[in-house]
Amino acid sequence: MEFKEDQLVKWLKLTKVPKLGPSKILKLFNLESDIERIFSLSDEQLLQTRLFNEQMILDFSQLKRASDDNFIRAIKECKENNIQVLTILSDAYPSYLKNIPYPPLTLFLKGNLELLYKNKVAVVGSRNADENAKNWTYNLSKKLVENNLVIVSGGAVGIDYAAHRGALDAKGNTICVLGSGFFRMFPEKHIELFKEIERQGLLISEHLPNFPGSTIALVQRNRITSGISNGLVMVASGEKGGAMIQTKMAFEQRIPIFYPKEELNLQPNEGVIQIKKDWAGIEIESVEDIIKKLIIRPEIRTES
């Protein structure tokens, strides 16, 4: 299902209703397949769907009455800046992403959408990783793209940067999942990196272009990073932090989790020890160790 611009405004409003998450919205569209029809339902009809309670109906009513201006402006900005909008109802939305816990309802994308259908490996780790860990990550990413795999990471300093840089320098493809909108990307010193990824890969956000980012958004984007990937490599991390939250999400999504040999002593390594002990991680010595354990999804297009 594809939306016209006025329908997309309604969709964006609908997704802002508190407690009306992906599962309920998908059920709602199974009952009422037209966004215009949903917006015309009476309070009683909304209650009869058993997807809304009285407070949600009040919230929805307020959103319907609210000005459309911010959403209209955001959609215009997307068109003017080559930002593509993909909803969970779109035929182009990857089916495997729908199956993760709490899938993103709307994706904003810049770059090569075809990479959504390629085999991908998420490479993550600490912002404070040592030089050995960053060098190992860089070389791993180069080897992975040489084997027709796409590198997925989050654009942060440390391991993320090394992962993207290795893929780009090897003339491969990489995807960056952002925790902000496209007009507010950070860290600022990576703006040129983000531009390069747009040209040679794909930028993904679930937020309107002017969203400034937040701690919660950075955590939430992790489910997309692992959700679009066939496996995840956790290079170096302490016991806590974003990389460990990301790895836990990958574990819950049941994708393979890989880690470097402990003997390499890539720092910090407390997280690697925990993965080995608690999360059935797979120790790797070579790229081949990753490739043979990846989950290959049916809709992923393989190289001929």
Where are these regions (language model features)?
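Glycine-biased, small-residue-rich flexible motifs in mid-sequence functional cores and linkers
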Residues: 2-5, 88-304
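Short, positively charged patches
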Residues: 1-135, 142
